Amino acid sequence: MIYDIIIVGTGAGGATVAHELYNENLNLLILDKGSNIPLGNAVNKIKITDLNLEIEPLEDNTEYEFLKQPAELMEIVGVGGTTLVSLANACYACTSCYKNSATAQFKVHSLELFEELLDASKELKVGSLPSHMMGPATKRLVKEGEKLGYFMEPMPKFIDFSKCDNCGLCLVGCTKGAKWDATDFMEDIKSYGNPPEIVTGFTVTRVLHNEGKVEGVEGTDKNGAKTIYKSNKVVLGAGALNTPQILRNSDITQDVGEGLFTDLFITVGGFLKDIKLNKEIPMGVKSEFGPYFLSPHYSAQLVSMIRDKGFELNESDVMGIMIKIADESNGKIHSDGTITKTLTNRDLKLFEKGYKKSVELLTAMGVDPNSISSTAIRGAHPGGTASVGKVVNKNLETSIEGLYITDASVIPQAPGRPPILTITALAKRLSNNLKEELGSL
């Protein structure tokens, strides 16, 4: 059998393409190397990868706690991808927040996503967190922040607030059906009268091609058996860490795996009795500062760190603020899968600015200054490893005809903002292009 399209990956990109095309009378095959993850169990599937972060020589002697811990990169393997553990942040990645936003970057390459962003927002039920859903900790942060002159705005979320009980467990995987994730699209596909074939536990190793045209994919099934699937087109949505390896194995090497960014972040927090941030919708508001932003965020890592400083506390006694930056796109995924990256002085200065503002906000809220701690530097939004203008063109097509990419690897530089809405819009654009092309054949 020769499929019309093989879709690799079921995260925001792959699932959206599948959802857009499943009722278009096309012969689709959807592949994912992960399996179905039970509701509420997604956080246990998070994979932590070492991020070999080289730190440029510091311009001052300040010893920040977050520089003393190994940096980490977070990903998840399973149907739905990282959408399962997202905090439902639907950032539009527009220039009003950051002049080098994802949308601005795409415009340079004649890729305009305005209509697709609106369409994605409607389908994902995006809306700003309403004031009645903000918990006491978030409201207190807003109050103190505004006293200090910081503009705090509600975070756009892909949450159906009529179903949300404010449990604060978005990271675990929503069991209430309130938070959108890519499995919602996959369930729609499965319930279709004539659903496409879906194969889980299948690892694509390379794309087959002949004379510059796609012929299918090769990979291994859950039992380790090598299998070949034939198709006229292939859409890669395997994620910015996996897509480069598939491309390299498929004879596309120029600029592949280079330019990695991860939207690095830390969470700074301290002891504030019974603040109960852990029981609120996470990251309910944000304060924008161009290449970085601040948002209330509970991190379980902070509990033991604060205890180590002599404080007796429970999880409900932690107040935290996330600092997320648009880090420089200087990382690399090597052929053996190891990841290296440099934390530049520019990156560090952004963290320093955010750290100082966070400490100011925390102490204004009443956090004991002696308890203030910082998590390790982490990256949860890897991208840039197969960017538009280098590895793909404005139609998201590679040098192999019929091979497309629709994940964060095509974003050229770090937007410093959650990318799910952007990826969904990209996937909708690609889907529209494929409909037009296949409809004319």
Regions found by a protein language model. Name each.
Residues 60-62, 67-68, 73, 82, ...:
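FAD cofactor-binding and catalytic pocket of flavoenzymes
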Residues 96, 123-128, 152-192, 337-343:
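Helix-loop-beta segment of a Rossmann-like dinucleotide-binding subdomain
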Residues 1-99, 219, 254-271:
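N-terminal glycine-rich phosphate/pyrophosphate-binding loop and immediately adjacent elements
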Residues 20-23, 34-39, 44, 191, ...:
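Glycine-rich loop(s) and the adjacent beta-strand/alpha-helix scaffold that form part
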Residues 166, 170, 199, 205-210, ...:
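A glycine-rich dinucleotide-binding beta-alpha-beta segment and adjacent secondary-structure elements
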